[in-house]
């Protein structure tokens, strides 16, 4: 009879209630310990545990058999990857890191960055050559001192032409130059005849530790008899909830009657922060279910409802707009908690989505540490590995998830390299489409029949498309 590895020390799981070694021998011991942690943690919390045979409670007859299995993998990373369910189609997002300090920092908005955020595209007529576009310049960053602006185009880094094979390595440098270029559309709507022309300006960029405020831009737009609030929000970071609430105080003071929420570059973040933002947008649904977090079959008792609230974690009252309709701007980089905002709000109010189809991620994660109850408390000091696996899935009050291929927009517009526009400007294409819809205009939207999509590469941020559960301070 097989011994079941229930691993009682992991059954506590109160964390869900908001809760380099140089010596060779040390390396071997550390690696063995880390692999043991990886398997036991995934066995305890992984959302798709029942789909992975090697995570079954009765998979191994003895500790010796389990140890032999762990020893068959040369690194913790390879072991972790072997435990992922259908990496290409289902679990595209679970992460292992050998430096949880770095992960913690980025989830709090801190990273090594030049302050220039890019999109990359395959050059028309090529299958390997790439050009980049500056999509955002972060304030008070190294890039903000260079004169770069949104929409600037470049095709070289450190003098090397950009290709699909060298782009990642070039971006990994702490210091590099970009060579500006010009996008020539040949005065036609056809993309295939567009050209990227070399320029003569070179810009120096340097990475530094940067704390990013996710509130990138907000303003009031007066249009006929309407007052429209506009907010570009780039990450659900709990440390900025009070500042976000102040933005909504300004919207309330100005008595706005429409809101355009720009999430086109927002790849996710804290579930509680998303719940509080939804409560700022509405207000009339206090204490009703905003979203539901569902765990694996063994952890159903941990399932949790996130309710619309009227206060922040610090007990300050939330400034609520009581809106019945919202406009949300998206791109193919909008993910996770951004998608949850759309999916969960649409159960209560009208959501007009403008832009591109989103990533398609309903699942939530939590940092899992090597400690007795998998929390940060009393963490193993012998290494800095941690996991960020998918542990739960979010559904709205109607038990609907975000489609795995993303949420399709009501009005489909893809950013064009030849016309990015300025963030917050009424002529910026995505915002302009929202303003036209608010006006009830019969004018045709620029639907971009000839679309060019960004090249799929990890951005300058190491960890993206994350929706995570974090211990509450309440």
Sequence positions of predicted segments:
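Sec-dependent signal peptide recognition
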Residues: 3-10
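Flexible, low-complexity junctional segments that flank or bridge functional domains
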Residues: 21-258, 451-474
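C-terminal "post-core" interaction segments
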Residues: 230-231, 239-246, 251, 258, ...
